[in-house]
């Protein structure tokens, strides 16, 4: 027999819904665990996120606001980090209008200067800031294909990639271009026709990077 359960819907994308379907408009989790829709709230039991990132709300909202007030406001580097993280929401929205590339912000300098902490602060406005498989805070220790695959269908949530020296792949410049462009390189089908891409293959966000060397210097090498 069939158990009488309510129907549940899932979405893999996060941020601004690029498909503009009838049911999904804005897919941002709020502090109370609901997914926000343009004209109201969608009950979380009806719409669940099944994508790449751990974005489940944690902690206490009031304590987080107090932390921002006490520890961030008035200290310019921390204010910049939070502003960069929040700008992903704006960037994800305006790209279809002004067609700007993804913003890549690279924090560089000597070790133990707070680069990683600043990157964690930037992504903490949207999700878990610890390095783990489903976190918005990632490591450069990955292949270019894995990096691009992790970012797909993200249209408004900031991501961070820690320590650029850990990237051992080739063609660093090509990776940076792909991150800025918001999609992988164009490819051909078996019949030599250009493979079509859709919104599920793209991403529009802000990417925070860290390292002791500059991003341009790494590309030149």
Residue positions per predicted region:
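Short, glycine/acidic-rich hinge or "gate" loops at secondary-structure transitions
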Residues: 11, 95-110, 188-201
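Ser/Thr/Asn(+Pro)-rich, low-complexity disordered segments
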Residues: 27-29, 36-40, 83, 101, ...
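Secondary-structure capping and boundary motifs in well-ordered enzyme cores
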Residues: 74-78, 110-114, 118, 149-156, ...
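AAA+/P-loop NTPase substrate/partner-engagement loops
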Residues: 108, 117-172
């Amino acid at each position: 027999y069939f158990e009488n359960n309510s129907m549940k819907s899932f979405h893999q994308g996060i941020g601004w819904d690029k498909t503009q379907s009838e049911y999904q408009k804005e897919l941002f989790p709020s502090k109370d665990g609901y997914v926000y829709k343009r004209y109201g709230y969608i009950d979380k039991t009806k719409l669940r996120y099944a994508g790449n990132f751990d974005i489940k709300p944690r902690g206490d909202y009031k304590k987080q606001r107090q932390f921002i007030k006490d520890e961030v406001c008035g200290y310019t580097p921390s204010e910049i980090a939070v502003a960069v993280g929040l700008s992903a929401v704006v960037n994800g929205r305006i790209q279809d209008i002004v067609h700007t590339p993804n913003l890549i912000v690279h924090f560089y300098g000597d070790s133990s200067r707070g680069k990683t902490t600043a990157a964690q602060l930037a992504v903490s406005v949207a999700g878990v800031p610890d390095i783990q498989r489903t976190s918005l805070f990632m490591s450069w220790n990955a292949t270019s294909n894995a990096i691009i695959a992790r970012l797909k269908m993200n249209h408004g949530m900031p991501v961070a990639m820690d320590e650029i020296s850990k990237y051992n792949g080739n063609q660093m410049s090509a990776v940076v271009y792909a991150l800025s462009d918001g999609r992988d390189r164009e490819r051909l089908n078996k019949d030599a026709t250009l493979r079509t891409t859709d919104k599920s293959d793209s991403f529009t966000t802000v990417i925070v990077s860290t390292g002791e060397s500059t991003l341009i210097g790494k590309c030149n090498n």
